From Swiss-Prot:
Involved in the biosynthesis of lipid A, a phosphorylated glycolipid that anchors the lipopolysaccharide to the outer membrane of the cell. Gene3D superfamilies: Hexapeptide repeat proteins (2.160.10.10), Udp N-acetylglucosamine O-acyltransferase, C-terminal domain (1.20.1180.10). It catalyses: a (3R)-hydroxyacyl-[ACP] + UDP-N-acetyl-alpha-D-glucosamine = a UDP-3-O-[(3R)-3-hydroxyacyl]-N-acetyl-alpha-D-glucosamine + holo-[ACP]. This is Acyl-[acyl-carrier-protein]--UDP-N-acetylglucosamine O-acyltransferase. One of its GO terms (biological process) is lipid A biosynthetic process. SUPFAM superfamilies: Trimeric LpxA-like enzymes (SSF51161). GO terms for molecular function: acyl-[acyl-carrier-protein]-UDP-N-acetylglucosamine O-acyltransferase activity. The gene is lpxA. Its main location: cytoplasm. Pathway: Glycolipid biosynthesis; lipid IV(A) biosynthesis; lipid IV(A) from (3R)-3-hydroxytetradecanoyl-[acyl-carrier-protein] and UDP-N-acetyl-alpha-D-glucosamine: step 1/6. Homotrimer. One of its GO terms (cellular component) is membrane. Belongs to the transferase hexapeptide repeat family. LpxA subfamily.
Length: 263
């Protein structure tokens, strides 16, 4: 039986300059502004607003009341052209806000593919979010935060501006981090954001075998348990990286740090 629901609800407002694929659905009272592109298979629920310049890929779902592509919340923003780019297969839940970039921060906010952003998540200007991440309710990313692939952020957790969160990391409920979180690391459920071991369960679910997880745990102990100065820990990690691609990735992440490392 063919679905008789209209693709564009009669109460929706679509700017003439917006470009929507033929099968995009837009719900009641939603607004699609100027210079917005939305790819095939995407659904925009009721009461959403999407402002441009924004590029949205295929098969995304905006459940309702999401505010996407709004101006950056930065007093230095002076109306320069900046944009938001969202990939494919993302689920954006109720009251999520994702802002465009700033001229001083690269000009673009990026969200990758297959992410879940639950209610009241905020992704600020110039953030770069990878693929396959889960942001639980009230996750807050300040400006310029970079999040790697397969990161899980629990409810009411957040990251300070310019922080990086490495791939496969896990932030516990209410965790706040003002330093870079290395790949694979768990951050405790407290306001101080202390490291609490390796996200072993998540790695197992993603197909990491025992040998890889053992190497990652050894690297974590070198960095956080052995009591070494960071310079000495990096020397040991460099040796371990010779036999582990995962440790090599951790070391490269640490070497690229511009903010203090979560310690």
């Amino acid at each position: 039986m063919r679905d008789s629901t209209p693709l564009i609800h009669p109460t929706a407002v679509i700017d003439p300059s917006a470009t929507l694929a033929d099968d995009v659905r837009v719900g009641a009272f939603s607004l699609i502004g100027a210079d917005v592109q939305i790819g095939a298979g995407t659904e925009v629920g009721p009461h959403c607003s999407i402002h441009g310049p924004t590029r949205i890929g295929r098969n995304n779902r905006f459940i309702g009341h999401a505010a996407i592509g709004g101006e950056p919340q930065d007093k230095k923003y002076a109306g320069e052209r900046t944009e938001l780019v969202i990939g494919d297969g993302n689920v954006i839940r109720e009251f999520v806000t994702i802002n465009r970039g700033t001229g001083g921060g690269g000009g673009v906010t990026v969200v990758g593919n297959d992410n879940w952003m639950l209610a009241y998540t905020h992704v600020a200007h110039d953030c770069h979010v990878g693929n396959h991440c889960v942001f639980s309710n009230n996750t807050t990313l300040a400006g310029h935060v970079t999040v790697g692939d397969y990161v899980i952020i629990s409810g009411f957790a957040g990251a300070h501006q310019f922080c990086r969160i490495g791939a496969h990391a896990f932030l516990g409920m209410g965790a706040l981090t003002n330093g870079d979180v290395p790949p694979f690391t768990m951050v405790g459920s407290d306001s101080l954001g202390r490291p609490r071991g390796i996200n072993s369960e998540g790695l197992k679910r993603r197909g990491f075998d025992a040998e890889r997880i053992t190497a990652i745990k050894r690297a974590y102990r070198t960095l956080y348990v052995a009591g070494l100065p960071l310079a000495d820990a990096k020397l040991q990690l460099a040796e371990q990286a010779k036999s582990s691609e995962d440790v090599r990735g951790m070391l490269e992440f640490i070497e690229a740090a511009e903010r203090p490392l979560l310690r």
